[in-house]
């Protein structure tokens, strides 16, 4: 850690962007971890917790619009307007996604990293995603830009949640290559025994391309996102639903909704 501090004082930009990578990977961040494991607070909600969670889960798991969901809930005797449904998804999905990252099963150290595209306010934004060699979700990040800075932020986020990989497979993107190389620069500076093997082989990322399809299938029916923060929150919920579908949690013998609900406990 002394090496990192020294380079930070010298203003090394790549180190400044990644100075906490090894802190998280080596388990030196127990305070943050304990905070993240706290249960989600539903105080002040005007509906029962299970009703809120059912609505959020249904929206992020199935291809429906908010008005569709409003009608579905009304048929079950629950009167709630589409604006409230949107508020629930935006408020609770990111919190549930944080819990999901803390509780997901161990993932493999061989990563596949790529990005796909979504529209927010009529403009394209970029969804960075990483899965392991078995297709298990590692992490994700919505970005308004597709550049080296975004790639660096994503690698930092993914390593924070899933540890340092031994291999990263990317496409021919120069930005993603620079992001992965920045991680190796940090490992060199901090005296790591091994660096990450970086491969640019498109066909090895086919498993991630197939993974993208689930996300696109759900978002296709959402009639577009009006704001970046609501898009990011909704994507977080969709990713959790996809992780449940892929049995990434220890209680995967339970129903998908129960697994989702238990992430809030």
Where are these regions (language model features)?
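Charged, often Cys/His-bearing segments associated with DNA-binding zinc-finger transcription factors
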Residues: 1-119, 148, 152-168, 172-265
């Amino acid at each position: 850690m002394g090496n990192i501090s020294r380079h930070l004082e010298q203003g090394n930009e790549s180190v400044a962007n990644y100075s906490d990578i090894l802190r998280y990977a080596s388990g030196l961040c127990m305070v943050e971890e304990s905070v993240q494991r706290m249960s989600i607070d539903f105080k002040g909600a005007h509906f029962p917790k299970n009703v809120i969670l059912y609505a959020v889960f249904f929206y992020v798991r199935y291809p429906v619009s908010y008005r569709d969901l409003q009608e579905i809930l009304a048929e079950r005797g629950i009167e709630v307007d589409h604006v409230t449904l949107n508020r629930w998804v935006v408020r609770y999905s990111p919190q549930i996604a944080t819990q999901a990252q803390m509780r997901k099963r161990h993932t493999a150290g061989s990563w596949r990293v790529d990005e796909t595209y979504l529209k927010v306010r009529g403009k394209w934004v970029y969804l960075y995603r990483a899965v392991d060699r078995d297709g298990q979700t590692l992490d994700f990040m919505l970005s308004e830009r597709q550049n080296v800075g975004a790639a660096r932020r994503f690698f930092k986020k993914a390593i924070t949640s899933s540890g340092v990989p031994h291999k990263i497979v990317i496409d021919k993107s120069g930005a993603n290559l620079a992001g992965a190389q920045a991680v190796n620069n940090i490992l060199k500076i901090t005296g790591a025994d091994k660096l990450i093997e970086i491969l640019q082989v498109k066909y090895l990322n086919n498993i991630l391309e197939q993974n993208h399809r689930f996300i696109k299938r759900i978002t296709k029916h959402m009639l577009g996102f009006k704001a970046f923060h609501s898009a990011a929150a909704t994507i977080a919920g969709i990713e959790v639903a996809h992780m449940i579908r892929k049995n990434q949690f220890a209680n995967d013998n339970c129903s998908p909704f129960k697994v989702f609900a238990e992430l809030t406990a």
